[in-house]
Design a protein with these regions (language model features):
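Metal-dependent phosphoesterase signature
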Residues: 49-88
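Active-site neighborhood of HAD-like aspartate-dependent phosphohydrolases
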Residues: 6-38
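Short glycine/proline-centered loop/turn elements that form peptide/ligand docking sites
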Residues: 88-89, 164-167, 184
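Single conserved hydrophobic/aromatic residue that forms the stacking wall/gate
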Residues: 1-8, 12, 183-189
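Helix-loop "lid/cap" segments that line or gate small-molecule binding pockets
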Residues: 22-23, 43-58, 115, 147-148
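Substrate-recognition "cap/lid" segment bordering the active-site pocket of phosphatases
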Residues: 79-82, 108-160, 165-174
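Substrate-recognition element of Asp-dependent hydrolases with the DxDx(T/V) motif
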Residues: 90-116
């Protein structure tokens, strides 16, 4: 994940501004940035469904929002996002130590790859998976199983690091050990 606790609100802003842009273009009401904290995490289609007003949450409308969102987000997905503090150094250390590193995101594939290429050009990831056509999004464990196959490792050899409940559920569904970093405060949890 690409945002530290101080920056979480800014990172959500990239998705929030892009979603608000799409909603506005389609004549729907927009949301305050803070509300997006509770809309993100299950892929962009679920984000759009949550952002659309009641009575407008059809598959057709989700696709309409997606059509407006993607070109805008492709340009603006790194406006405010930054890696978590210390993550570039940690990834470099893991790479130097010969540990395989992969990415499993619910962002769509092109955006995931663009962000990884932008922020971590010196890091070799064995796989960078975003939301892919025909593959269920997290918390479905398919993405983890795909990475296990590429890495040729067992579940017992994996440490899944995530920053959301969806990540922890994904790890549990895949049967791998997980560590959580969260931007949420205790009263929110």
């Amino acid at each position: 994940h690409l945002c530290d606790r101080r920056q979480r609100q800014m990172c959500i802003r990239d998705s929030a501004h892009s979603t608000n842009h799409a909603l506005n273009k389609l004549g729907y009401p927009t949301h305050e940035i803070e509300k997006y904290n509770f809309m993100v995490g299950n892929g962009i289609d679920k984000l759009f469904e949550r952002a659309l007003p009641e009575g407008e949450k059809s598959k057709e409308n989700v696709l309409r929002v997606r059509k407006e969102f993607v070109p805008y987000y492709d340009v603006h997905n790194a406006d405010d996002s930054r890696p978590y503090s210390g993550i570039p150094e940690l990834l470099a250390y893991l790479q130097t130590s010969g540990i395989q590193i992969a990415v499993a995101s619910n962002k769509y594939q092109a955006a995931t790859q663009k962000l990884i290429d932008h922020y971590f050009p010196e890091i070799h990831f064995i796989a960078v998976f975003g939301q892919r056509e025909g593959v269920k999004v997290k918390p479905d464990p398919t993405v983890v199983f795909d990475i296990l196959e590429i890495a040729k490792v067992t579940k017992e050899e994996v440490l899944y690091v995530g920053d959301s409940g969806v990540d922890m559920q994904t790890a549990a569904n895949a049967g791998v050990t997980a560590v959580s970093y969260t931007h949420l405060t205790l009263p929110t949890i």
